[in-house]
Amino acid sequence: MSEKRRDNRGRILKTGESQRKDGRYLYKYIDSFGEPQFVYSWKLVATDRVPAGKRDCISLREKIAELQKDIHDGIDVVGKKMTLCQLYAKQNAQRPKVRKNTETGRKYLMDILKKDKLGVRSIDSIKPSDAKEWAIRMSENGYAYQTINNYKRSLKASFYIAIQDDCVRKNPFDFQLKAVLDDDTVPKTVLTEEQEEKLLAFAKADKTYSKNYDEILILLKTGLRISEFGGLTLPDLDFENRLVNIDHQLLRDTEIGYYIETPKTKSGERQVPMVEEAYQAFKRVLANRKNDKRVEIDGYSDFLFLNRKNYPKVASDYNGMMKGLVKKYNKYNEDKLPHITPHSLRHTFCTNYANAGMNPKALQYIMGHANIAMTLNYYAHATFDSAMAEMKRLNKEKQQERLVA
């Protein structure tokens, strides 16, 4: 009968257990791929003390118990050791065909993970407290609440893949960010009727910004996304039927420059009606066009709105223009305008028609929203004044019905 192996304290070691010359305990096992794997600890059991100068750790037999539980539960004991960066790369590899801006966003997040200590951690070691600490570090590094929330959502999706693949049991990113960070997101600006009138009047009269008057007016009267607006070409305008055909958007990337993309969703492909003000504004835009050399981008040319270099304008151009316009207005007027972006004009358009009682499905179509919830809950901003006006309108209708009856 073979003699039982013992450690340096005379304790019998079980099958697979051994002790190295430096005193560290070792457990050897064979993984699902037939490859030998090893687990180490300075302690055999939980009550042991670690040698002087060594960091405290989980005992070998506690680690063996966790390992055996993982194997019993079908957990991939190799897969759970992949790093967070590797897991995120695995998720992205499962959906390789994405838009360029999505690809750019993925790269940004991967770069963040590579620089953060969480990125090199094995996914089985990441706890909810670790994920929350990551969110706090992101905030301390200047990232906005909404940006952190978007990145958290991506990592949460990555861990769902790990759960489905039996690499981990729980999702450490399954928590509400607002329980960790204050939501400092600035409410989206919706212009009042008075603010809208003042903005247009100032732009029309100002020597610097009068050239942008029709652009602002069209954005307010069509509700187009700025990428759709910037991508408009002459063939997209149907003056006979008074509509704008939307089937593409123009974007610009710092690395690849200008490029054309299809709309964000299938619902983005639509025909937006031209109200009279938009119709006349488009007519003025065409009348004022110069016979400059036309650029071509991904097969599209005859862009309507060009910068000084005869390249089509994009979001950054309009953001800068609106910022300068509002700054100049506020310099000379006591009744200040709020921070306004091109997207503020889209919000204003949607809110105006929602408050006017437009059929929600019709408004959803015009806005190009993928689902009705976005139209109702995300863009349509109700105010006390609009709520009061709506109540008065309904009460007036009821009174008229009674008189007729």
Curated annotation (Swiss-Prot):
It comes from the Bacteria. The active site is at 225, 264, 343, 346, 369, 379 (o-(3'-phospho-dna)-tyrosine intermediate). Residues 79-163 form the Core-binding (CB) domain. SUPFAM superfamilies: DNA breaking-rejoining enzymes, DNA-binding domain. The keyword Oxidoreductase does not apply. Pfam families: Integrase_DNA, Phage_integrase. Signal peptide: none annotated. Keywords: DNA integration, DNA recombination, DNA-binding, Transposable element, Viral genome integration, Virus entry into host cell. InterPro entries: CB, DNA-bd_dom_sf, DNA_brk_join_enz, Integrase-like_cat_sf, Integrase_catalytic, Integrase_recombinase_N, Integrase_Tn916-type_DNA-bd_N, Tyrosine_recombinase_XerCD. GO terms for molecular function: DNA binding; integrase activity. The keyword Cell inner membrane does not apply. Residues 186-392 form the Tyr recombinase domain. One of its GO terms (biological process) is establishment of integrated proviral latency. Belongs to the 'phage' integrase family. This is Transposase from transposon Tn916. The lineage of its organism: Bacteria, Bacillati, Bacillota, Bacilli, Lactobacillales.
